[in-house]
Structure formats: structure tokens, C-alpha cells
Amino acid sequence: FFRIPVPMGVAGWCFLQVEVSFLAYLSTEASMNDDVFTTVDPDALNMDNLRHLADINGVGTSYYGWTGGHEEVGATSLLKVLHAMGVDVKPGSSDEDINRAITATEDAPWLRTLPATTVVRKGDWRDLWVHVNDGESVRCWYVLEDGTGGDLQQLDRPVPPRDVQGQLRGRATFEIPGTLPTGYHTVFAEIEGREPVSAPLYIVPQKITPSRLSGPQRYWGVNAQAYSVASRTGWGVGDAWDLADLSAICAQEGADFLLINPLHASETVKGMENSPYRPVSRAWLNVTYIRPEAVPEYATLPNRQRHQIEQAREQLMEEIADEDQIHRDPSWQAKSKALRWIFQQPRSTHREAEFNAFCLAGGIEQERHALWSALTESVGSTDLPKEYRSATSEATQKFAEEHSADIEYHKWLQWIVSEQLAWPNSVAKKLGMQIGIMADLAVGTHPLGSDYWSMPGVFASGMYVGAPPDMYSQLGQNWTQPPWIPSKLAETGYEPFRQVIRAALKLAGALRIDHILGLFRLWWLPEGETAAAGTYVYFDHEAMVGILLLEAERNDAILIGEDLGTVEPWVRTYLGERGILGTSVFWFEKEEGTDLPLHAD
């Protein structure tokens, strides 16, 4: 049994920062939603049909408010959310539009030969529906990660064909055997006379049982904000070197883990975001945690340049010596000049090979993050001019051709920070910590960040994530983070989600998932509206949690879900059954009927 105390004061401070940032963002020209909506008169629509359309698209039509009352979601909110998900309706749509959208939604799976992504628990036998033109024969097989495979057996499950856009479509049912091993596999379907089509088939653990939780041990640890742990030898903001030192101190004191804030990427232009819970990307790391002097190529710099770097560091420390606040901007401005010099130094043969391998593994996703970083530095803002707001625009591609060295520099920064941020967990393990670094996963990303810029089709334009009204915030909360569209995420094979989990787990022995309820449902609210105008959008939690477990199992990592707040009772039970630990506020844990702290048992 494992619980983590949550400092409420810090949480309150984080919400304050989010609200201030939101107001600043609304003043920019970079609106994510250019549509002009009209108000809907619910009396003019068949609400039963609209609610049905919402239901089959995973959009909540009602919820229980903080007072316990049953709240109905209005027509305007439902139509705006559905529109943002790619459903062909919007405020002002007619009943005929809604009926057409219902038909299109119900036809969609019949138009696909294979489901977008199939996620199955290991040991479960699952039906796989394959759709073909009526009367066509089809063969299905699977290929495992290791290259081996086998045929899938077709079951005798006749289903009446469906008329889809004037074409009769049939359904064949195949069986996915429960004997398949866990992993990211592929299923294939071959219709007579056509090229085979494929789709992801993921077999995930029923439950994770990390080796460190196999016995009766009880663990304790320390919670620290990495950026605040700044040493006299650093650059005014805590970095990987400082975090490794803190990790060593905690290990020597007998701690089993060190819980830190999210290490997701931030912008590298002036006006850097203070909150680590509003990153520009969750798939990449925060390069401000680099310690320049610890980069191997630093030692090859001419003495003059090393002296200049040390002088710049000392001057920075003198300027902020009497300050109680954390100065990210001046720290990074001084540090980045040093890193530019180090980047230009020749690398040894093996170091160059390692860097090239890192870039190759990063693929197009790393290329785009580096391009976005170079663009924002060139412009001096994350609010890019219109011609650069698309990763594939002509202007963006021209910039990429003309600034290849800057793009390579930002790839190099990611390589260096990934090396250095691996130190704290390595030190912890060497010195006897049972768990090591406990990483933290933020809920989402900045609307002007590289994740949204790189993959706009996966995000819901014109929507933000937040929380419904409650006793403390009767207008609700707006976290100003664009959400993923569930169906679009599935069409990618959940690749963006997999990247985020992998990035966090490669640096840690455990992972805390902030607002883990977001794997089940998220409160969406339209841009420009209060949170009270929102509704819940549901995700395929079996797929999301299953992928999370598969990545954790491969790293023998512990998972902790931050499950505070309004939670449906079955959710905590479900998480526990899958091996994900929960969170409690320490100060509120009392023996029943007393003011005594909860007993250790």
C-alpha cells in the first residue's frame, strides 16, 4: 500500500499561474478556432437525436454537479464539442444535419476494413470485426514484434449486411487468441484480389506487478521541484547536476524515491512558462536542465572560451544572488550562449555516432520539435506569424532549408539533456534507492507549443481542458490545454501517447500521472467560454491504461495515479485491479471517528 502526500499550497499556486497565462493567451491573434458560431435554441432541435449523436461519439450529455444535482449539457455546448471532434455539425445545424451525422458516425466502422487500433489484455480472447463488401472473402493474420506470426481463425458469426452509402457492407468475425504475448503487434487483412491492409494490435498486461512491490516493504521519499534545487556552482536554476546531487543526498539518508516535477520541454524564448505543468511538449525534455560544463565537448573548448563561460555564470549568479525568485529567462540566455559554443566543437567518432543514432531514433517527431524550437527562437515568440503556424507550410519548409544548423542544434540539445537527466536515477540506483526518481506526467501541453504545432490533426481545435464548477471555483477551471481527439489518437495507433509515456519512464523508476482521470474522461470547454459551458469527453480507457501498463512493465516501473477530486467509485477500483497505485492527502488521512493519524497498517 503506497500513498503520496500532496502539498495543497503548491497546487493552488499552480492553478493561479494557469489562469493568468490564459488571460494573456486570449489577447494574442493566434486563435485556434476561426469559426463563428451562432447560439442554438434547444427548442428548435430534437434533443433526443442530438444526445444520441453525442453518446455514440463519446460526449457526455449530463453530469452530476458539485451540489449533487443532475446537470444537463446544453445544445450549443454539445454541438461545439462535436464540431471540434470532426463531426460534421456545429451551432446552427438543423435536425437533418444531426441525422446525417448520426448515420455517418454509425457507418464509419463499416467503412474501415480493420479497426483503427485494437488493444486486448493478455489472456483474453477477443472478437475482431473485419468489414468487406458483401460477399467478398477475407483472410486475417497477425505478426508479432519479433517477426513471427500466424493466421486468425474466422468464427461462424453471420451478421446481416449494412447499406453504407449505397454499397452493402458485410462483417466477418475473427478471433484474437488469448495466447499472444504482450507487445505492439500488427494485424493484417487481405480481401480477395487486393493488397493487404494492416492495423495495430496491442496485447497489454492484465495488471502490472513491479518487482519492488512484490513484498511487504514500505517506502518513503522526498518531493522536490527540480528547478528550485539550485547549487552555488550552477546557473541560478536547478539542473541535472544539482538533481543528481540531491538524489545522492536522499539515497544516503535512506529515502527510497525522489518525486520531482514534470521535466517536459519548455519554450526557449524570453517569457518562459513558470509552470512545469504547461509544457510546449510532453514528448521531449526541458533543455534548461542542461549543465554546460558537464557536456564532454566542454573540455575541448579553448581556455579563453571556458573562461568567458565561467565569467558569464559568475556574473549571472551575482545579479540574482539576493533574489528569492527563480529567474529562468536570464539563466537560459546565459547558458544558451555557452551551449552554442560547445555545440560547434568537433565530437569524437563514437560521440558523433551516438548523436546520429539519437536523431535517427527521434524520427520526424524530433525533426518537427527542433524545427519549432528554431522557428520560435528566430521569431522571438511562441506566437508564430501566420505563415509559420503549419509544420508543412511553404514558408516553414523554406525556413527549415535555410536554418538546418539551428535545427541540428536543437536536436543536439535534446540529446544532451536526455543524457544528463538520466544521471539522477542512475545515481539513486547505485546508492541503494529502491525506486529512484519518480517522474511526473502533466495533463497536457501549451496551445502554442510544439506538440500542437506538430500534430494539429490529433488535437481538438477551439477546445481547452479544465474542470467543471465546484464549491471552490463556481465557474469551473480552464487549464488552457488543447485535448487530444479520442478517435484521431486511435488512428495514430496511440503513438503520441506512447511517446509521452516512454519519454517519462526512460528517466525514472516510477511515474506519477497527474489527473489520471484524464485517461477516462476530460472536461472540454469551448475557447472563449467559462468552464461551466463544457462537458465530459470520454476516452477508451482500456486502450490508454493498457498502453500505460505495457510501457511500465517493460521498464519494471511503478505507476501512481493522482486520483483526487470528483472520481466515479468504480475508477479507483479499476486502477487498483490493474496495479496502479493511488494518491491521498496525508493531512486528511484519519482513523475513522477520531482525529488520530491513520494507522500504518
Where do the model's predicted regions map?
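Short, Lys/Arg-enriched N-terminal segments with co-localized hydrophobic residues
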Residues: 16-31
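Basic helix-extension-helix modules of the SAP/HeH family
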Residues: 35-88
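Acidic/aromatic-lined carbohydrate-recognition and catalytic surfaces
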Residues: 83-154, 158-190, 200-455
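Active-site-proximal helices and loops of the catalytic beta/alpha 8
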Residues: 425, 429, 444, 448-470, ...
